[in-house]
Amino acid sequence: MIPESHPRYKSLITREKLAQYTKTGIVSLEGLTAHGRGEAFDYLLGEETTESALRAEKIAAALLLSANHPVISVNGNTAALAAKEIAQLQLASKARVEVNLFHRTDERVQAISGLLKEHGITLVEGTVSRYIPLDHDRGLCHFDGMHSADVVLVPLEDGDRAQALIDLGKKVIAIDLNPLSRTSKVATVPVIDEVTRALANIARFCTELDQDEITGLTREIHGTGFIRDALEYIRERLLNVLD
């Protein structure tokens, strides 16, 4: 039992939750490693949403609201960590939600789908085909999901699938704490923030933006600027960490 007074309470509870979800197949063992890598970058960012990330989240909301067919791609870690926030974002953005896994089995898809449905999320389901040109199960998706999407939100995604979606002409919103990842580098909008904070902020902006703001935010997007901002923020924190 971790006491709430522990200075690392939220971090430890999150790790414990992920470990528990490995027992049901929702989170893969490899997913635990990926989470640890992201958490290290969250330490460097001060475990808070930067002003630059907040602007990226506002642009992400504008892209979802302006899309004809927005889709949120969900993997095991995202479902385990942020099912509540995904439900809020689906309600605010009207985006479709699709389960897509690196380590894919029918059992894992069913377990993750069940968790999401428990939170009131409506899923794109049915037959999948290899619509994304990848030699792996990550290439499998639904015709009415990512195949037809013009904007795809991919939290905690791997770089080659993000690149494949870009190559298909889709705009990609990535949520990734690592500003040096391939995913961040190729995304239309790289959101350098922790997934629950990011999704909650994007959902909030979806309820606040008016049409003029949406048009202005999506007119011209420079994703690399958010990467530079994150790296500069980390550099400044490291220079002053002992002050």
Swiss-Prot record:
EC number in record: 6.3.2.36
One Pfam family matching this protein: PPS_PS
GO molecular function terms listed in the Swiss-Prot or TrEMBL record: acid-amino acid ligase activity; ATP binding
BP-aspect Gene Ontology terms: coenzyme A biosynthetic process
Keywords noted in UniProt: ATP-binding, Coenzyme A biosynthesis, Ligase, Nucleotide-binding
Record InterPro entries: PPS/PS (IPR002855), PPS/PS_sf (IPR038138)
This protein's pathway: Cofactor biosynthesis; coenzyme A biosynthesis
Catalytic reactions on record: (R)-4-phosphopantoate + beta-alanine + ATP = (R)-4'-phosphopantothenate + AMP + diphosphate + H(+)
This protein's record includes keyword ATP-binding: yes
UniProt entry tagged with the keyword Ligase: yes
Top class in the EC scheme: ligase
Xref: PANTHER family: 4-PHOSPHOPANTOATE--BETA-ALANINE LIGASE
The protein's role, per its UniProt record: Catalyzes the condensation of (R)-4-phosphopantoate and beta-alanine to 4'-phosphopantothenate in the CoA biosynthesis pathway.
Quaternary assembly: Homodimer.
Protein's name in the database: 4-phosphopantoate--beta-alanine ligase
Organism: Methanospirillum hungatei JF-1 (strain ATCC 27890 / DSM 864 / NBRC 100397 / JF-1)
